[in-house]
Amino acid sequence: MDLQSIINELKRHGATKIVFKPLANNDNTKQQIYFGASFEALQLLPSGEVYSAGISKKGPIFKAPLNFYWLSPDGEIENAPGAQLILYPKYPEIRFSGFLKKCKSSPSQLMQAPTQQEREARQNKHRILFFGLAADRVIGYVTHWDEDVSLTVNAMVEANEYPAIATVFYDLDDNAVDTKSDLLNKLKNIYEMGLVPSQRIKNGEIIPYVAQNGAGFTLESLFGISPNGVAEPDFKDWELKAHSGSVVTLMTPEPNLGLYTHNLEEFLRNYGWSNKPDRMDFASIHKNNLLNKRTQLLLVMEGYDPDKQEITDPDGGLLLVDESGNVAAGWTYSKILEHWKKKHSRTCFVSYSKQDNNGIFFQFGPSIRLAEGAGIKNYLHSLFVQAVYYDPGINMKYVAGRWKPKKRNQFRIKWKDIESLYETVVDISLNDIC
């Protein structure tokens, strides 16, 4: 198949985004396929739930199944049920394995470990592994070293004609497109609109939004984005966040360990408080290795080496423990990774002001912050040094003869500390954009 045929077939089978990776000699079924010295591929690819897979010679291991299909040269697809991502936090790196198992139409002849003679002959040649990304699956296609597609795409990569994505991939859809410039130009237009009424998109139409927290919905509506809870970038490869305060909420994962998961009422009676007979609360900031005087709980990171900034025990996690060592609530590292992968590597924080005068209005800009490279290593380190903290808002109210729960488990960071989460942070004024 030529390049356009590959694109057409991947899209015919549901791909909405196409990326590719030039394969090195070491990218084979024996040594697995290298997906980068970070966990960004986990954010890019729609994988299954992350789980602990024990400890190997390479240290702790996490795995995530990948609903992966091979596209054959005749345009048919077949599932490779053993396909998975393997995460090595010690390095860190991700590898792709199991992609040939129980799949008759897999390109096994192209994915074998090379002999020394083959390795030397192919030293400056690359197969191209294409990934068509759909909502719930990945469709793969690989080319031969000497195919015209391989030669053409490799030449374009060397000429920097494809934007890099998730460290080792290239974005086929955005050939020669500068998404950052597009984003800033769009925001400049929105800034020049001045005050915009609070609104959101519902069923494809813009409707008024009267609640006080409408800045994010309004910004999304101006980009034509409908709130749907799908973990995809808001504008090309950027996540948009309207920002005006001193604190940023990073993620809201429910605990998967401890008393909280078994009996919320008992959790609140043991560690919360009650100012009214019909209400119990648990709402107090907890920071790593700092005893919370109100709840008498200590937040600890079990199985984490702060000096090496790496996970040492895949079955460890972030735990709230009482003075007897009981786990009140906790999050395994698998749970944290699973939630983190839904975040985006590139985030644009958009400042805004609000007016409440015969209706709520917002103006976005002029201050913009572009943050790139949101690595899990930075996130865990920020937790350890208390920059990221747990800020819950949990209660139960006694209504109609029963206790009714309201859960909000937030991990937050102060705006002044946000740079610790990213590799690069740049502040821009839209007034400077021509």
Predicted regions and their residues:
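Nucleic-acid endonuclease domains
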Residues: 1-234, 242-434
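Short hydrophobic-acidic sequence motifs that mark active-site Asp/Glu residues
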Residues: 237
